[in-house]
């Protein structure tokens, strides 16, 4: 599996190497995963693209490419994925997005993932009834702050509405993850929760759809 790009900072030689390795990984994706998930994802997005070409963005200096998808394995007892949205990640991983933003309209990106194997219990995707355009600050894992300075306790149903989705094996979800605050609930039971996923957005010239992870 690929190394996380945020660990490289701005070192161009390491970034070039990262992008080259990504392309090699993608060329061997059937061997790596036992199934051509990239073709499945690309075919799905092509049916939704309105005729636009769908592809993975090229790497720095046109060397290699971004990674098309990542697998996430969350083990029971190892917690959850805390509340976040795609737009807030641009502040945490600005080095990553600095290059991607040259070709891709990453703001308000769309998120997708496919459930490969759900946990025995827990692991639901929770979508909260607040958007990045209204709420842009994380106080802690259970508290957000909106643009009016009001605190939102995401554990309190009187403070915010939410929708929980439990996916079955093979289910794919596509949602406005750039704007919608969301989290993955704690994994319980004895089974790992295994998904693949990533993001999709228009190219800067609106002539293509790019997907990456």
PLM ranges: what are they?
Residues 2-5:
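Solvent-exposed N-terminal domain segments of exported/luminal and surface proteins
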Residues 61-63, 122, 188-190:
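A short beta-turn/loop motif at secondary-structure boundaries
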Residues 76-167:
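Catalytic core of non-heme Fe(II) oxygenases with the double-stranded beta-helix
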Residues 73-75, 116, 186-188:
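Short, low-complexity Ser/Thr-rich regulatory SLiMs
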Residues 38, 66-68, 107-113, 122, ...:
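Extracellular structured ligand-interaction cores
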Residues 62-64, 79-81, 183-184, 205-207:
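Short catalytic/ligand-binding loop motif for oxyanion handling, primarily in non-cytosolic enzymes
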Residues 129, 137-213:
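Catalytic core of Fe(II)/2-oxoglutarate
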Residues 8-77, 84, 96-104:
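Signature of the catalytic double-stranded beta-helix
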